[in-house]
Curated annotation (Swiss-Prot):
One GO molecular-function entry: tRNA binding
Pfam families: eIF2A
Top-level division of the source organism's lineage: Eukaryota
Swiss-Prot/TrEMBL WD repeat ranges: 115-161, 207-255, 310-350, 351-393
GO biological process, alphabetically ordered: regulation of translation; translational initiation
Biased composition (Basic and acidic residues): 545-554
Protein name (record): Eukaryotic translation initiation factor 2A
Gene Ontology cellular component annotations, sorted alphabetically: cytosolic small ribosomal subunit
Low complexity composition-biased segments: 466-478, 520-544
Source organism (scientific name): Dictyostelium discoideum (Social amoeba)
InterPro entries noted in UniProt: TIF2A, TIF_beta_prop-like, WD40/YVTN_repeat-like_dom_sf
Coiled coil: 550-608
SUPFAM superfamilies xref list: DPP6 N-terminal domain-like
Region annotated Disordered, chain positions: 1-42, 466-499, 520-554
Length: 608
């Protein structure tokens, strides 16, 4: 294991350490360096951020010279490293070299174990870091068999091995574990085989399903049964299907859904593990409207409820909120539309029309990055989801890797080879577009954040950039000037009034409210009053509440009072929303229930 390469002449590094006003940042570090930012208030209470990069000649993690490198952390500079990967919780990191796999502790860099196995192509840690799954191409070394192996990480010994001729990133990992590693599953020829998670190979249960192509375990639930989602593609006149099973009663499904136009699909579980989104694809469009096939989106819950959003045009990206029972879809021809939905498929917020195809929620669910990558220009918008306000916009041309750090403050973009062979490198910015770190790395193949538990980071107060910061960080394209006019005196700048908090909203932005009539149409009962008329003057006096006879409310009257209270809360929330004040996403759900409250109130009043 070689020392970190600190003097790479082909590497250009740019760092910026000034944080936003009133914004403290956790320390940024890397596996080849422990860094200390200018802000130290959080370094004793929050973990250090870390990321890994791998290029043609180097595999290391680096943040910048002035942050202070940690030479105890591993680095490879001989070009032998073929892949690098963190464990699910970020405590371990594996370097896949030509002849071995070196597993190190992410914090100190000490070697945890070494697996002597050449030519490994893919690896995957089990959720609790008990096992490492590896796959290699069949060769003379493995006698063209037993190329899929489960290793005991501590002992670096083989626990299970079998043959697997084909493997790609879409179906990897080929063996999957539940979050607690109690149960494992593997797709084998029209069946899903389930094993004891610590005794792979001993069959416990199986699901038989003709032409099944994928399955996914639900996230961990507190003491509940394990749930499995399966997908079967359409075949001829037979529709595709998605099903939800509950282990161990896998002989029958809990809920199912059938659909056409689904030769492939991506199945996404929500955070509670009780509903899935099925993002379907086809290679061709029979209607002839697209060269790239057709897409669809279906919702299926464990209790059997389901719906299709009937979205017109391509679906570019779908993501569940990491904290709420909501999901977001980016869809339509360019400029595309991005919409936040609830579990009933009702739209909550439209984020406007823009050339975007990527959705990235921050781990704490308070921030959102909408980007346009791939064949788009790399434009990005950062949104405050606590107020539904656009914070700022920026660009990252040709970015391949885009992801939030665990602190929900920093965002990394990376231009990677071999897809893009020029301008390779990484850039780390804050949500207000403050550039924290930038490095050009020729022939960069990998870049990724170290996984950390987002709950250990405090939710920072969201700070909006000033007008001057927005102008400096996002320069506007210049108007073309003919050469004959370039020496002429420039026109004086146009003075504009300062915008309100946040960047301008895109065209089509909309927050949906319930279509019901305002609850102000409900008139609460007035207290008894007496009216007297003297000299054409009418005087109304209201008896003090203390003079009213007291009596216990009936159950129906108590329910009416409770509904009235909810309607008053809705009125307050609507006023806050209209005035641009803070309103959490959960409050939108309450506003949308206004019609339901009114109907309940009318029904209760009719029972009096």
């Amino acid at each position: 294991m070689s020392a970190p390469n600190n003097n790479n002449n082909n590497t250009t590094t740019t760092t910026t350490t000034s944080p936003s006003p009133s914004q403290s940042s956790p320390t940024l570090t890397s596996v080849a360096s422990n860094s200390t930012t200018t802000t130290t208030t959080e370094t004793l209470t929050t973990p250090k951020l870390q990321f890994v990069v791998r290029s043609k000649t180097n595999a290391y993690q680096e943040i910048g010279q002035q942050y202070g490198k940690n030479l105890n952390l591993p680095s490879y500079s001989n070009g032998d490293c073929r892949h690098v990967e963190y464990s699910k919780d970020g405590t371990l990191i594996a370097y896949v070299n030509l002849n071995e796999i070196v597993i190190c502790n992410s914090d100190g860099g000490s070697v945890h174990s070494v697996i002597n196995r050449p030519n490994v192509g893919m690896i995957s840690f089990s959720p609790q870091n008990s096992f490492l799954l590896t796959w290699e191409r069949m060769s003379e070394y493995n006698n063209n068999e037993n190329n899929l192996i489960v290793w005991d990480i501590k002992q670096a010994s083989i626990l299970y091995k079998t043959s697997q001729k084909y493997c790609n990133q879409e179906n990897w990992p080929l063996i999957k574990w539940t979050d607690d590693e109690v149960l494992a599953g593997k797709l084998i020829s029209n069946e899903v085989h389930f094993f004891n998670g610590r005794s792979i190979g001993v069959l416990a249960k199986k699901i038989k399903l003709q032409d099944i192509s994928s399955f996914e375990f639900a996230p961990a639930t507190n003491g509940g049964p394990y749930k499995i989602a399966t997908f079967v593609p359409e075949k001829g006149s037979t529709p595709g299907s998605a099903r939800i099973y509950s282990y161990p009663t896998v002989n029958e499904y809990c809920s199912h859904l059938k659909f056409f136009k689904a030769s492939e699909a991506k199945v996404l579980w929500n955070k509670k593990g009780n509903a899935i989104l099925v993002h379907t694809f086809t290679d061709t469009d029979k209607s002839g409207k697209s060269y790239y096939g057709e897409t669809g989106l279906w919702f299926l819950s464990q209790d059997g409820s389901s719906f299709n959003l009937n979205i017109k045009g391509p679906i570019h990206d779908v993501q569940w909120s990491p904290t709420l029972d909501q999901f977001m879809v980016c869809y339509g021809n360019m400029p595309s539309q991005t919409t936040l939905f609830n579990l009933k498929g009702e739209p909550l917020v439209d984020f406007g029309l823009n050339p975007r195809n990527t959705i990235r929620f921050s781990p704490n669910g308070q921030l959102l990055c909408l980007g346009g990558f791939g064949n788009l220009q790399g434009d990005m918008d950062f949104w405050d989801l606590t107020r539904y306000k656009r914070i700022c916009g920026t660009q990252s041309h040709c970015a391949i890797y885009t992801e939030w750090s665990a602190d929900s403050v920093h965002f990394m973009t990376a231009v990677l080879s071999p897809r893009i062979r020029v301008d390779n490198g990484v850039k780390i910015i804050k949500y207000d577009n403050t550039i924290v770190y930038q490095e050009n790395i020729p022939e960069l193949y990998q870049a990724s954040w170290r996984p950390l538990n987002p709950l250990v980071f405090p939710n920072e107060r969201i700070v909006y950039p000033s007008i001057q910061q927005q102008k400096e960080s996002s320069p506007q394209p210049q108007k073309y000037t003919p050469p004959s006019l370039r020496n002429m005196q420039a026109a004086p700048p146009v003075v504009t009034s300062p915008p309100a908090m946040g960047a301008p909203l895109p065209s089509g932005f909309k927050v949906y409210l319930a279509s019901a009539k305002s609850s102000s149409t409900f008139k609460p009962k007035q207290k008894p009053s007496s009216t007297t008329t003297t000299n054409n003057t009418t005087t109304t006096t209201t008896k003090p509440a203390a003079d009213e006879p007291k009596r216990e409310l009936t159950p129906i009257e108590k329910k009416i009072r409770n509904v009235e209270r909810k309607l008053k809360e809705v009125e307050v929330l609507k006023e806050k929303l209209n005035s641009g004040e803070f309103i959490p996403p959960t409050a939108i759900e309450k506003i949308n229930n206004e019609q339901k409250f009114l109907e309940e109130l009318r029904k209760l009043q009719s029972e009096l």
